[in-house]
Amino acid sequence: GNAPAADMVLKAPGDAKMTKTAVP
């Protein structure tokens, strides 16, 4: 998804977490 680099690090392991940082 499209998010700041900081959030991407958390999403890298799995897009499943992206739902938490998808807003920003």
From Swiss-Prot:
GO terms for biological process: anaerobic respiration. One of its GO terms (molecular function) is metal ion binding. Signal peptide: none annotated. This is Cytochrome c3-2. Its main location: periplasm. Binds 4 heme groups per subunit. Participates in sulfate respiration coupled with phosphorylation by transferring electrons from the enzyme dehydrogenase to ferredoxin. It is found in: Periplasm. The keyword Cell membrane does not apply. It comes from the Bacteria. Residues 1-24 are annotated as: Disordered. GO terms for cellular component: periplasmic space. It comes from Nitratidesulfovibrio vulgaris (Desulfovibrio vulgaris).
